[in-house]
Swiss-Prot record:
Keywords: Cytoplasm, DNA-binding, Endonuclease, Hydrolase, Nuclease. The gene is nucS. This is Endonuclease NucS. Cleaves both 3' and 5' ssDNA extremities of branched DNA structures. It comes from the Bacteria. GO terms for molecular function: DNA binding; single-stranded DNA endodeoxyribonuclease activity. Its EC number is 3.1.-.-. One of its GO terms (cellular component) is cytoplasm. Gene3D superfamilies: 2.70.180.20, 3.40.1350.10. It comes from Rhodococcus erythropolis (strain PR4 / NBRC 100887). It is found in: Cytoplasm. InterPro entries: Endonuclease_NucS, NucS_C, NucS_N, NucS_N_sf, tRNA_endonuc-like_dom_sf. Belongs to the NucS endonuclease family.
Length: 224
């Protein structure tokens, strides 16, 4: 991983355009090729980013500024102009073992992948633990019409889980091979506040019956 602290300005050119004026920021270049720009006023979400596969080309013009051009397979560009570099270091972090889920959550994921029709008629599994630049989506599936659906699975559904799925959806919908991607928030219990937030963001909620998925007596699950 490469960490750069620099005064920089950033332009995104793609289906939409955006501009970040000059400020002091942290730039992360990860081993998977992803590039993200961070400020000091948010816990985790970058100001802008480019997901892999993407390619970084670094050039120096007539001025002392350094230009990074990050291009993805769709031809979208993240243009980062570094006016002053204060820190530039690289570290080899090695292979990460990944997040070890709570036993029930891990089993719920496994069971829902095996019984993906629980999500609705005609649903098919694409992959468990579908990797993104910010972590793995529990399940990536397709609905009966072939549209992509990201599924986040929790034992107890709270606002943090909805926020997590929202971040995944923002990222996945930037991939033209997957977009449009909708979301399903699945849990054994979903708090009312989380359900309200999910509905407001167009995310479907699914209350799971763990015993039913395990094939025991109960056959109840509810859609909201």
């Amino acid at each position: 991983m490469r960490l750069v602290i620099a005064r920089c300005r950033v332009d995104y050119v793609g289906r939409l355009t955006s501009h970040l004026p000059t400020a002091r920021r942290l730039l992360l270049v990860k081993a998977d090729g992803s590039v993200s720009i961070h400020a000091d006023d948010r816990a985790y979400k970058p100001l802008n980013w480019m997901s892999p596969p993407c390619w970084l080309v670094e050039t120096t013009g007539d001025s002392d500024d350094i230009l990074w051009v990050v291009t993805n397979k769709a031809g979208e560009e993240l243009r980062i102009t570094l006016e002053e570099v204060e820190h530039d270091s690289s570290y080899e972090l090695g292979l990460d073992p990944g997040l070890i889920k709570d036993g029930v959550e891990a089993h719920l994921q496994e069971l829902l992948a095996e019984h993906v029709e629980t999500l609705g008629p005609g649903y098919t599994l694409v992959r468990r633990e579908y990797m993104t630049a910010i972590g793995p989506v529990d399940l990536l599936v397709r609905d009966a019409d072939g549209a992509s659906v990201a599924v986040e699975i929790k034992r107890r559904g709270e606002i943090d889980g909805v926020e997590q799925l929202t971040r995944y959806l923002e990222l996945l919908n930037r991939d033209p091979l997957l977009a449009p991607v909708t979301g399903v928030f699945a849990a054994q219990q979903i708090k009312p506040q989380a359900k309200t937030l999910a509905n407001d963001r167009g995310i479907r909620c699914l209350v799971l019956d763990y015993e039913a998925l395990r094939g025991t007596e109960s056959t109840e699950f509810r859609l909201f």
